Design a protein with these regions (language model features):
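Reductase modules of NAD(P)H-dependent flavoproteins
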Residues: 6-17, 32, 169-291
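Short, conserved phosphate/pyrophosphate- and ester-handling motifs at nucleotide-, phospho-/glycolipid
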Residues: 53, 154, 252
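Active-site beta-strand/loop microenvironment that shapes enzyme catalytic pockets
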Residues: 145-166, 183, 255
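Conserved hydrophobic positions within beta-strands
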Residues: 21-24, 77
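Residue-level signal for short, function-critical loop segments
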Residues: 62, 97, 152, 182-184, ...
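Short, conserved beta-turn/loop elements at beta-strand boundaries and strand-helix junctions
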Residues: 26-30, 82-85
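FAD-binding FR-type
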Residues: 42-147, 164, 289-291
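Short glycine-/acidic-enriched loop or helix-start segments at secondary-structure transitions
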Residues: 138, 158-160, 258-261
Length: 291
């Protein structure tokens, strides 16, 4: 496993292909202000192969007048539906419709790639690149403990990861802990009243899922990682000291500082936590996919 940080401009986007939208389904609650969609895409090139947890690039139309012919963004391969008779591969990606507020003018701007993808309909085509390497690799030890911490669309790769383990790895013995953070239950997807893709694993002895919610979502309070993690603090800290424990983090970049603060309390000091985290990272046992 590697921990190298790679920036978008470093990805090779020269090899491109077309994909057709098979379906676009809203998977966030209708009552939620967040719109998150699951897109099934059929790739026109039968020779292109994909694996779960790889990333694919999407080239949304840019602004040529500003020198940006395309707007490039990465999305995790969240699922691999069975191909139809054509033999063309199909992939699933999860997309959250994003908006941004300019801190100076207060003006709202739409995320280019996310709004482009969320507006696509069945039959539309999209230009893609990749696939790119797997960020979260499964350890060779079947008794390894896996701690997955995700927020927002960061849950998508973990859905694929957990599915792969319980479908394809029959002798998994280690603990699998999933921490899912959101402002409220309405903002959770793949784990809400409309659709809970993790429900099939709740009876597995090795699997546990924990929700970390904001105490006051309407007041923009941050996700309460401290509550969800502190409730299992002693056992979690002991797991982090086990050389067979691997931690995977996916979501918004601000999670890094939020989690560092929580784990510093768990460790007893910021310095002690940063030493432990450095050890985990050096051993490839702390891996982040942040955007």
């Amino acid at each position: 496993m590697t921990q190298a940080v790679k920036h978008l401009e470093e990805y090779d986007t020269q090899t491109r292909y077309q994909a057709t939208v098979v379906s676009s389904e809203r998977i966030s609650s209708e009552a939620s202000s967040d719109e998150i969609r699951e897109l099934v895409l059929e790739v026109d090139d039968p020779g292109t192969t994909f694996e779960l947890l790889q990333s694919v690039g999407v080239l949304a139309p840019g602004s040529p007048e500003f020198g940006n012919e395309h707007h490039f963004r990465l999305y995790s391969v969240a699922g691999l539906p069975e191909p139809e008779k054509s033999g063309r591969p199909r992939i699933e990606i999860a997309v959250k419709r994003m908006t941004y507020i300019d801190p100076y003018s207060g003006e709202e701007y739409k995320g280019i790639a996310s709004n482009y993808l969320c507006d696509l309909k069945a039959g539309d085509t999209v230009t893609m690149t990749g696939p790119y390497g797997i960020v979260f690799e499964l350890p060779e030890e079947r008794d390894a403990n896996l701690i997955m911490i995700g927020s927002g669309t960061g849950i998508a790769p973990f859905r694929a990861f957990v599915k792969h383990i319980y479908r394809d790895v029959k002798d998994w013995e280690g603990k699998i802990w999933l921490f899912y953070g959101a402002k409220s239950g309405l903002e959770m997807f793949y784990m809400n009243e409309k659709r809970d893709d993790f429900a099939q694993y709740y009876d597995e002895e090795t699997f546990q899922a924990f929700k970390a919610l904001s105490p006051r979502p309407n007041w923009a309070d941050p996700i309460a990682w401290d509550r969800a993690i502190a409730e299992r603090g002693e056992e979690l800290w002991n797991m982090l000291g086990d050389p067979k424990t691997y931690v995977y983090v996916a979501g918004m970049e601000k999670m890094r500082d939020e989690l560092d603060g929580v784990f510093a309390v768990l460790a007893g000091s910021k310095e002690k936590w940063l030493r432990r985290k450095a050890e985990l990272m050096a051993g490839g046992r702390w891996v982040e996919l942040l955007y």
